[in-house]
């Protein structure tokens, strides 16, 4: 593959990684701005499921921080493999929660996130425009 095509593919990977990072970051920031409101909303959403309230509450306080950290790492391209793994695990937890709620529309959206985390993980060798690459 010629250098120009390789650079174009690496740039496309960067844009996808950056977009996922911004998405995760803004989700985290939005929830952290009113964490108690998010906590109460989550408790209400899971009130008819088998999950105990303390577990829902604990999750609602942890998820925004996880989203924020994963987002920052993806934006910077720092510890990208680990950030992608954590992001995929977070999405798995969210899919589980959506399944318990029988919220198939939200689960469909989360499955799309899962596919993007897979693509970014599978094609990690294209992660040229990143702090990880500068650290090599």
Where are these regions (language model features)?
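Extended, low-polarity transmembrane helix blocks
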Residues: 1-37, 53-65, 69, 76-136
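Perimembrane loop-to-helix junctions flanking transmembrane segments
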Residues: 39-55
